Curated annotation (Swiss-Prot):
Biased composition (Polar residues): 412-423
Annotated SUPFAM superfamilies: Ypt/Rab-GAP domain of gyp1p
Taxonomic classification: Eukaryota, Fungi, Dikarya, Ascomycota, Saccharomycotina
Name recorded for this polypeptide: Oxidant-induced cell-cycle arrest protein 5
Family from the record: Belongs to the OCA5 family.
Keyword Methyltransferase included in the entry's annotation: no
Annotated organism of origin: Eremothecium gossypii (strain ATCC 10895 / CBS 109.51 / FGSC 9923 / NRRL Y-1056) (Yeast)
Stretch list, region Disordered: 401-431, 497-519
Keywords from the UniProt entry: Cytoplasm
Listed GO CC annotations: cytoplasm
Limits of the Rab-GAP TBC domain: 39-348
Top-rank taxon: Eukaryota
Subcellular location(s) of the protein: Cytoplasm
Composition bias type Low complexity, residue spans: 497-518
Length: 560
């Protein structure tokens, strides 16, 4: 019990250190370090309303957008693209938006079926926000229900205009330089509660932040609409699939590094699922849960909406942290954004601006979660490395079985070590880190491996489930990061902050942040016995990525 308590205290000590550092980075406008933190260990929930706008301001998918269009439909019979614009009247679209929002807000158990006035104001504001987005992007994207749930998900962390950060009733619009007024620093009203039992409550009531810290907070760089628009551009991002296919000799591309459309993501998910969890894959595909029906709408929410509606708000926010914190090396931008004709690499700093001790708490092994041997050394996007196929061939050459230097066959390669040693080793080149470890694979592809990790974590439970229980799990995924949520809610409790001097000294001298489990594959699915963090899930996802890549290489070498 004493050991468990000490571990909990160390965990919360790390979270408090993280909150302090993020506030400092906000003051410095160090968006590169904020992005590194977001994608590797997540943004503290107390600070997402300030960090997310900064991350979105400098996000490559926002600066050079390309979203998945639902107004261009490919006609297979005519073998051409057909433009299908929104054919509903504006009022009908507004009613559709309100109908979808009411599914979240209205208490079905109530006799009145009418939300409270403040809830009603939030619903109207979110409707107007969505309509404003559609007015701007209507030629590319017409209304889908995902927009309503993305808006709701954002409102759970970011206050709508006219609430909290400026006086209510001020016309519903705030300037883009919104500050926390003195005396109201603890008033950041957001949506809280379970579905159909929603209240408007200060974010700091659920996730406390002491006044001495909240008084140091910076101005928010975007209002709610601007944050929403940019978030949608990231969630709905899609590479130019047609352009990519033209670069490949046979017209076929397998963009599991640079990213593909939702159809490709879904196909890749099931391929990895079959390889990683064959025992679970079989009953999944046998059940109607994965067929083209209403029961399969979880695929839409997992892949197109990036966890909106179906994930717990804390886990969904972690997924969005990964998306918003994604940053490739500036020199490789055009590999991931092959449609891009803008020059904005100068916006990103490649030099690490974190002290070594803190950096190795953020990146436990000095790498991005989704690193792979030699991938970070390749000049992606340069001649000869413009497509995923070319990159994979080069990686195979770098990680072959036979050592070209010694000529000794059967020498274990670095890839072999990555595939067989499931827990990531520390790479020697990263011991004295001077450069930021940038993202190496598309963020939506990263989510695929996180989803596989979720299924692996719950494999034993799912194997025992009936079809209806599997469907419920997929459409209402239970809270995964229990330790994160509990720790942040109790972060500044007296019991949490009253560490002994020995505990504090041990935590400060620790070179890595604590982990709740030695290995995620131990006690998989025992949700009631072990509390997990999203960091555990991300590390498992990275391990699955490297193991899957190893098997891909094995197949490629066998086919030669």
């Amino acid at each position: 019990m004493a050991l468990q308590r000490n571990s909990k205290q160390n965990q919360q000590q790390w979270y408090r250190e993280l909150v302090n550092k993020v506030i400092q980075l906000l003051q410095q406008n160090d968006h590169d370090s904020l992005a590194l933190i977001a994608r590797n260990c997540g943004v503290p929930p107390q600070l997402r309303h300030l960090v997310w706008p900064v991350l979105l301001k400098y996000h490559p998918f926002v600066i050079s957008p390309s979203i998945l269009s639902n107004t261009l439909i490919f006609d297979k019979t005519e073998d051409k693209w057909v433009y299908e614009c929104e054919n509903r009247a504006r009022r009908d679209v507004e009613q559709a938006v309100m109908h979808d929002l009411q599914k979240f807000f209205v208490n079905k158990r109530s006799d009145q079926h009418m939300p409270l006035p403040d809830i009603e104001q939030h619903m109207r504001f979110l409707r107007d926000t969505i309509m404003r987005f559609l007015d701007k992007w209507e030629r590319v994207f017409k209304y889908e229900v995902a927009l309503a749930w993305i808006a709701i998900g954002l409102a759970e962390w970011v206050p709508i205009d006219g609430w909290g950060e400026s006086a209510p009733g001020g016309g519903g619009v705030c300037s883009e330089d919104m500050a926390l007024p003195k005396g109201r620093s603890t008033d950041v009203p957001v949506l809280q509660g379970k579905r159909h039992h929603i209240t408007i409550r200060s974010l700091y009531k659920e996730y406390p932040l002491p006044r001495e810290l909240s008084s140091r907070l910076t101005k928010r760089c975007f209002n709610f609409y601007d944050t929403f628009e940019r978030l949608v551009l990231v969630i709905l991002h899609c590479p130019d699939v047609t352009r990519t296919k033209m670069k490949v000799a046979n017209g076929r591309n397998y963009p599991f590094i640079s990213g593909g459309d939702v159809l490709f993501q879904t196909q890749l998910f099931f391929k990895i699922f079959q390889m990683t969890l064959p025992e679970l894959y079989q009953p999944f595909t046998d059940e109607e849960s994965l067929q083209s029906s209403r029961k399969a709408d979880w695929i839409y929410w997992w892949f197109k909406a990036c966890g909106a509606k179906v994930m717990h708000k804390q886990d969904r926010a972690h997924l969005w942290d990964v998306l918003l914190g994604w940053r490739p090396h500036p020199s490789t931008l055009n590999f991931y954004l092959d449609y891009n004709n803008k020059s904005f690499a100068h916006l990103y700093n490649t030099k690490l601006n974190l002290d070594p001790q803190f950096f190795h708490k953020v990146c436990k092994h000095g790498n991005d979660h989704f690193w792979f041997p030699d991938l970070d050394t390749l000049p992606l996007g340069s001649p000869g490395l413009e497509t995923d196929c070319q990159v994979v061939n080069e990686l195979i050459r770098h990680n072959s079985y036979e050592s070209k230097d010694t000529g000794a066959p059967g020498t274990p390669s670095k890839t072999s070590q990555a595939g067989n040693n499931y827990r990531s080793p520390i790479r020697p080149s990263q011991k004295h880190q001077k450069d930021i470890p940038f993202s190496l694979i598309d963020p939506h592809v990263q989510l695929i491996f996180i989803y596989i990790a979720i299924l692996q974590q719950n494999e034993f439970k799912l194997l025992e489930f009936e079809e209806a229980e599997i469907t419920e799990f997929l459409t209402k995924v239970p809270l995964l990061s229990k330790t994160d949520d509990y720790s942040y809610k109790r972060l500044y409790d007296e019991e949490s902050t009253s560490l002994s001097s020995t505990d504090t000294e041990d935590s400060q001298n620790s070179s890595s942040r604590p982990s709740t489990s030695s290995h995620m594959m131990i006690e998989v699915g025992n949700d009631d016995k072990i509390a997990n963090t999203f960091d555990d899930l991300s590390q498992l996802a990275g391990d699955i990525w490297r193991k899957w890549m190893w098997f891909e290489f094995e197949e490629s070498q066998d086919s030669v």
